[in-house]
A protein has these predicted regions:
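Nucleotide/phosphate-binding catalytic cleft detector across ATP-hydrolyzing
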Residues: 1-56, 76-90, 110-197
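Short hydrophobic alpha-helical module
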Residues: 44, 71-74, 98-105
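Gly/Thr-rich phosphate-binding beta-strand-loop-beta motif of the actin/hexokinase/Hsp70
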Residues: 48-77, 95
Length: 197
């Protein structure tokens, strides 16, 4: 996406020099002087790019997608940017389908999300066991999908950002010396502030 649509998207963002709008009974007038386009997830690691020596993969696991990019010797390789429609929402749907097949009932997605984020929720053990089992399987599939994009756990470091990092952290089997999970929910915003300086 970045390579093929970045110029068009930047032109779209810069189509107006000034934007005027009202929000909560206050008028705003903004002068747009430029726009920078970055790969998804990049802002969350931009400040620490100096740490990305050798071969690395960045995976931004969001609600609907996983955005992937290689970073080689501190240089993002935008030619390796790709997106997999395999985010946390698909995991929640899969879990609820399994619960429906097994117990002929469903669990509210907020309860499933609580288990995915924290590893536990106030539910019967039989439901918790299904959620954990499915989350472990889904996490294995995430790591397999990264391999399709040339991730090699023995020769690369993996940096995970985004809310879906909790899946890997809580249910994944990985080498903690080679996989780094940034679970700061403000990492992207902090990164954009850093890039704007």
């Amino acid at each position: 996406w970045l390579g093929s649509q970045a110029k068009e998207f930047k032109a779209y963002l810069l189509r107006n020099d000034t934007v005027c709008f009202s929000y909560k009974d206050k008028d705003y007038h903004i002068n747009i002087v430029g726009a920078d386009i970055f790969p998804q997830g990049f802002s969350a690691i931009a400040k620490n790019l100096f740490m990305f020596k050798g071969a690395n993969m960045l995976a931004d696991i969001g609600n609907g997608t996983i955005n992937i990019m290689h970073i080689i010797d501190q240089k993002p390789d935008v030619n390796t940017c790709s997106t997999e429609k395999f985010g946390t929402e698909q995991c929640v749907i899969r879990i609820n389908e399994k619960i429906m097949q097994t117990f002929h009932t469903s669990i509210h997605e907020n309860v499933i999300t609580e288990v995915l984020r924290f590893g536990i929720a106030d539910i019967a053990e039989k439901y918790l066991n299904i959620i954990v089992e499915e989350a472990r399987e889904y996490t294995k599939e995430i790591l397999e999908r990264l391999k399709i994009h040339d991730y090699d756990a023995e020769t690369m470091k993996l940096y995970i950002v985004g809310g879906g990092g909790c899946l890997i952290k809580n249910f994944g089997e990985y080498d903690k010396s080679r996989v780094f999970i940034n679970d700061d929910i403000h990492a992207t915003a902090k990164g954009y502030e850093y890039l704007a300086e």
